Amino acid sequence: MSAHPDDLFWQQILNMDPTELLSDDVISSTCDENTAAGTDIMQPLCVDMSVQPTTSGCHTGAMMSDSYFSNDTPDQNCQSHSTLTDLSPEDMNNQINVQPNQMTFQPISPPIQDQNYGYSNNMINPIKPASIIKLHGHSIGEMTVTDPSSHVNAQHFVQQSNPKFFLNMYPCMTANSQGPGECQSVHNQSSGSGSNSYDINTAPRDEWIFTTSGGESWVLKRNTPNPPNSRTNLIFNNAQPIFHTQPQVSGFSDCSYQGGGLNSREYVNLAGYTPVCNMQNIKNSWATQLGASIDCMTASPTGIDANVNSAFQPVGVVSNNRGANVSMGGMGNYIENNSPWNQYYKSEMANNSINVKESNVYGHVGCVNDAISDKQGGTANVPSSLLNPDHQDWMRMTGTNTHMLNNINTNTEMENYDFPENDGNVHGATGVDLSTLSNGQQHSAFEGNGTFPVVNTGNPRTTLNCAPQLFLLGGNPTIAHPMNGNNETPDKNVCKPTPSTGVIKKLNFDGVDRGGGIGNFPKLASFVAMREKMSNTVNPSCGTFLEQLEGLRQQNSFEKNISFADLHFSEEDDVLSSASSVSCNSNCDMKIEVSQQGITVSNLQQGFRQQMNMNSSVVKMDGSYKTQEMSNGCATDVTDNAGTIQQNKRIHSQNENPEDGQVREGGCSDVRNEPPRKSARIHNMKSEGVTCGMCMTAADSTRQDASGGSSSGTKNEYYDDESELTGLSDTDSDNEVQCCQEVTKVGPKTYSSENFNPEYRQAKRLLADIPYRRWIPDPVNMEDNDGPFIPIVTRPATVCMNGRRRRTFFRQCVTAFGPLSKLTYFKELLQSYVSKNNNSYLSISWPPKHGVYVMSEKKLGYEHIPTLKDKFPLPCGWMMVLGVVGAEPPAALNKNMVILLCENRWVLLHNYSNSTHELFLAASDLKQFMEEGLSRCDPIYEESTVPYGVAMENSLRDFLRNSRTFQDLMDQRDNMHGCNWTFNGMPGRLGDRVIHLCNPESVDSIPGDEAVVCEGRPLYFFAYVTTFKSNPATKATVLIAADKDLRIYGYHKGRPRIRYLCKNVKTFFKAGARKFYLDFQITPKRLLAVNEEEYLNTLQNAPCLLLKPSVFRNIYSQEGK
């Protein structure tokens, strides 16, 4: 058996010096096992293999046939592109440099006729599709057929005399031409029957002459050089589709396909702007990849093609968004499209049915605004959102083998781009002449017998013509949704950029030219591998890479050895080094192996070595297809009938609990016919023999724990009483997977939250702030700041608890407060709104499942406004009651917390429990209140319905249960000295991430008992807060202490600063140390150290707490953090 293609791929990459690998003049050659044998080029029946150079001067880098263009279209649109001045800002957006003199050949062998290939996820014997030649991201030639009888609309067919096919180009390589006449030789290093040498020469007029080992020459046209002296080099070509709707059009090949009324078409690459036509233009955005010279690196087998048995029937049109728009002929053809916005679809349409061999449709929609390469500076600026760990895996069908770099993805605010809500499909209807239909009729006509999805990024209201449409929406190139069915709304929040590092010397995250970042490809690969390990994502390519990486580290001794230790941040944040090693055994059980000494490469390999064996089978049905993906005991059935995808998860699983020896069973039923929600892609890790994570979530578990093990318990999932500290973890609401399994109580134990791996949850919370790591070591200058607001970097909302659901909460809040916020801000109008909407519930964005119950002063019996004006410094003008705070109905109202509106638009929270008055600045206006919620208000954290900001686990639960008295707390700090938990799940400072329990007697840098006194109360220190788990107490940001009444204080040693934080330990684990830096409580007049006007100005400029990621980066990047 031949070597594993992934092994060969990575071996060739790892055998190269990093500097050579990332140099501009690199000549890399990587091929899979299919090209190793060096077989002769297969020539199908009735196909004449020949290549002719481009004859038209306006074509840049595309090989065309001997056809001509009707209506003189090229003459009207052929224009040179020598400068950047002709480009509009939209055209320049999202473009990066690609070497102008590179030619890339893709490593795919031709299929064998009359033989169907099976697909296995390990890619030992992958299907062998046909090849095409791609020059600088463009189609080198066209594929046509010669049998007119194979077309549905045969009367439109005009046979060409000399059709072209490009098949079986052996090597996968990228070559740079230094000048005319220079010869370069690239060798195939794959295993097989020896190496083959291929010579590349530059001929006059910048043509390429490619000579195979058999002596056959291919003449290829090279791209025009990039415009000189430009910071961002651009080659801007537009792929212009030319449609022919007349019955008789001479000189063109007809590429209709069965099952759809597609008439003849041909794609031409034209320089300059795309002309205004009556058709939807196809925008060529191939330049949005991060370098073309690394195409071979990222071209591991990710898809397989359809096969045609004996008849050469056309199967449709496949296009990429870099200009490689090729009409698929009868032979199975493969279009390798390595663009950041990409999806493959290969199928055969014959006899009005679809025979699908592979549907690699995992590419979601997205836009990357800042992915712009600086050729001269050698830096690729990558948005930090590429590393969002919440979206590490997208919907996969039929066992797609997704390689490593494809697992870098982004979370994008798609609503900012007005992306159309469509299903992303184009469907074919038999015998329909699209030219006779209107736009809307064309789209509906595609819902026919036999579904043929293709890449579609146009609005369904545009002229689709059953062809790939690329369109700039919101000024950014986008691609369509994955094929999720006819009527489903796909997930728009994820895109799948595939960055390459061909000419890039450095990857700079967050899109700013800074010195930090990951310096070369192996570091990026190592990071992705670690992140995927922590997210429990099984990825064969990553596992192979880690094996090769470890082997290289042990075997090679040269100076520039690629080492796993090159990963910069893993050495500091030992959450990544002390967390559990994850593996997935044959029964799809999540196995946890905790290593106190840290994670090694061999530990990481285990998570990828034990992979789920997936088998795919394809069954022809009447006008539909059915693809089944099996993962041993856990199965996913994907059925598509007229474009509807139905997913049925996890039919059965059994596991044995090592503690009680009982076998637990749980069946899964079909719960929905919609695409899996994005969090469903993450397997929730469980230890102690818990069943597959797709069937049960943390929220399910904690609800069962709260109800005594019964899935039908009535106790609130956030409720904590004297006996239980239950599901108040930040991850409970983050997991959006619907419960698809009814838990059966077996023996004395049931599924509970203690079965979940806490270190995985903590690591998830820490990994969420990886894009913000440059701001984490944020120094706090206590010397210059003594007011209520110390300048710090606040934690973005996406990192806080319920961060992944915050968009949902915010949307609900905007909907609820919309009518109120649109009112003219007059007291009479506001009072009228309150009286008309009395007792109505207005959702707020934070905390989750809380809101404001609208209630008038008279209804509430509230008479404290004069008291507040007398005791507190408040702006002049009227004040009125909006309502009271309460949890999601049905719930008891907390009439002691009242929301007030001021004439200057302030939103205040008045808490008057226990005969004391506390006033908090909730927001500066209603708009800010919708975004911030009650995150600034201290009393809300004392409510039992507010979740903790720390991942709940057994040790933390025991600590909270046994710290209800002062003496218990002192005992716990001795017994649990050294315990630490992730602390960054609540609003507050970004750098406060881990809390450590400690005994001051064992730590020299922490003051002893009663050494510090606050307001006559001696303090007893029991914990400290750091940024990383590995930080000692000497690097603590805040020391945590308690008095004998269990009131919690924060203490900073630099300039001794003591701040009261909260009233007990449980509240501290919900509120954190935010009040130490940002205190939104309004100080009474009698305690003011400054005059009222100055204090009110300070409140007016109070910083926001829950920032959106885009706002966060905009604010702190400008400050140079």
UniProtKB/Swiss-Prot annotation:
Sorted UniProt keywords: Glycoprotein
Glycosylation sites noted in the Swiss-Prot or TrEMBL record: N188, N325, N351, N449, N561, N615, N838, N911, N914, N980
Segments of this protein annotated with the region Disordered: 179-198, 649-684, 701-734
Bias kind Polar residues: ranges: 701-715
Family listed: Belongs to the herpesviridae US22 family.
Protein name: Uncharacterized protein U95
Gene giving rise to this polypeptide: U95
